[in-house]
């Protein structure tokens, strides 16, 4: 049974509305002031509120404003009872959050119809809210599952650490590193287009495929061949129109050679040197379209020698495509400058980087997954 709250300082109108609505099968409670109405609403949220506009103390529009600002009461349907019928007054009521109006003197059939319509919308809002909570629960479970698939940080013979902060909707970031032999390690990070499970599932598929080395007769030491094989396997026509960017590298700790290839992914950043004044910055990126976008896409390798005490950062675009408080978008160049400034000033750079990005972000949650891999070679 739906519960309806009537707020009116006129006792006769209270009783009139109570009797009429109870005949329709509703449970009706009453309040004589706005303050009392708010307390009753907080104690037991009704499905619908009918509130007089002009009352001593809190007015109906003030009651409406307070109730609608409470997230727990957002689905409560609010009807303002008023003798004011100007457009300006109705606009003022709508701005406060009112859902409907009933003009005095009250016409019974109109009131009953508006209450029925309001309760239908309340039920619909409740159903949508329930579905939203279920979806958020599923996304939270999916987030935990993705986290469980990620590798653990390592300290020897390389020091590899990471930060992974999924967006509220969960995106398509995934990464891994594994030894191909005692001297060579493959490191990669990918970012699937879009959000939600449709983006996450292809990323998990790629992770499992590369981790198990299920692509037979593939030279996993050759990054360009790996990307070409992934492009043949994950054409977006067969993967829900989802494509992904990826950076894939293989490091040999004996020769200190890093061979890499990228597919539409941001450049990885290699920092070498002993102080901020003599830091060498290398942007490691090769030409190549995102995987799955074009069947005939070509990928090429590049390589570099890793100097002593170098650090490599591999990241998704969520690390720098951040909306600031002034509405502007942060940049890759600014992100690189943060990496350089922290390279020699602190030990746990990733913690400082993440805190800086959280403070920089103007929104409650990040719009995209944020993934950063850090590889310290010595």
PLM region descriptions:
Residues 129-312, 364-378:
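… and, occasionally, acidic/histidine-rich disordered N-termini of signaling adaptors
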Residues 14, 56-57, 65, 74, ...:
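The feature encodes the CheY-like receiver
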Residues 15-23:
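Charged docking surfaces used in two-component/phosphorelay signaling
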Residues 197-220, 306-364:
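Active-site-proximal, acidic helix/loop segment immediately C-terminal to a metal-coordinating Asp/Glu
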Residues 44-50:
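Active-site beta3 strand of CheY-like receiver
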Residues 2, 32-36, 47, 59-65:
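Acidic catalytic/metal-coordinating carboxylates
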Residues 55, 67, 93:
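Receiver (REC) domain active-site loop signature in two-component systems and cognate sites
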